Amino acid sequence: MQNIAGVGLGLRRELIDDYLQAEHVPDFIEVAPENWLGLGGRHAKQFAACVERAALFCHGLSLSIGGPHPLNLEFIGQIKQFLKQHQALLYSEHLSYTHDGGYLYDLLPIPMTEEAVDYVAERILKVQDLLGQRLVIENVSTYAMPAAEMTEAEFVCAVLQAADCELLLDVNNVYVNSINHGSDALAFITAMPPERVRYLHVAGHQQISPDLLIDTHGAAINDPVWELLRATYQHIGVRPTLLERDFNIPTWQQIQSELQQIQQLQQEAGDV
């Protein structure tokens, strides 16, 4: 599979016009395939034009890899076709669940137990067999740790090993969880196996109280997350890094400024 480097942008529809008109665009874009499956006409043409300008990563929302119900094989087949049709370089999903008899409209944490490791790994292996490629799983932000028997870092590493999959390391989520649970963000980063880290996410968050952050993707990246990203490059090496901005969409110039800041950190880390 082709590799890509550099900086990327989570492409939201509010950004598409600016993206298509921009003289310089990111190295890659990322979309949720669920938002584009089955669309035709103007939307399909617009999406095709976007993909022509940059490499495509796909980041799913509803696989529910940790959910209690059987995997949706029809949906996985649709994803496989979408990835092939648009020549997506990878498919990532959240290490969480979104279905419990119905769609829950949230990313809920999986109990961090040995039993859950085995269960999730079996489902990831099944998805990888069906897709014919590795799945990239993302560490998620959490606000409670139900029935935890191990740390988050231990759980993520165990799943990566058991399923032989790759990691989308979300640096903002690591920081958010460190505040919400009183954990060590840098210790989490250094515990991740560098050879399995495929790419990174960074984003802004909302502070509700001194010990509660919400991963909103609705604000600029703040200084502690920038510093954690710098440390991440130092410990695991420079990886493709994507900016997420889902709400309170700023100007294209502001988006470009954050992308350039990511690029600057990558260049500095590459010079070390």
Spans of features found by a protein language model:
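Boundary/entry segment of secreted carbohydrate-active catalytic domains
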Residues: 1-19
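Hydrophobic faces of well-ordered beta-strands that scaffold small-molecule active sites
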Residues: 5-11, 27-31, 56-59, 91-93, ...
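Acidic-and-aromatic substrate-binding clefts and catalytic sites of carbohydrate-active enzymes
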Residues: 16-17, 33-45, 64-74, 144-149, ...
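Acidic (Asp/Glu)-rich catalytic clusters
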Residues: 19-24, 41-58, 74-89, 125-130, ...
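Gly/Pro-rich active-site loop or hairpin
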Residues: 38-40, 70, 107-117, 178-237
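Active-site acidic/histidine proton-transfer and metal-coordination neighborhood
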Residues: 72-167
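Acidic/histidine-rich catalytic cores of soluble enzymes
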Residues: 128-212
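C-terminal helical cap(s) of enzyme catalytic domains, especially alpha/beta-barrels
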Residues: 252-272
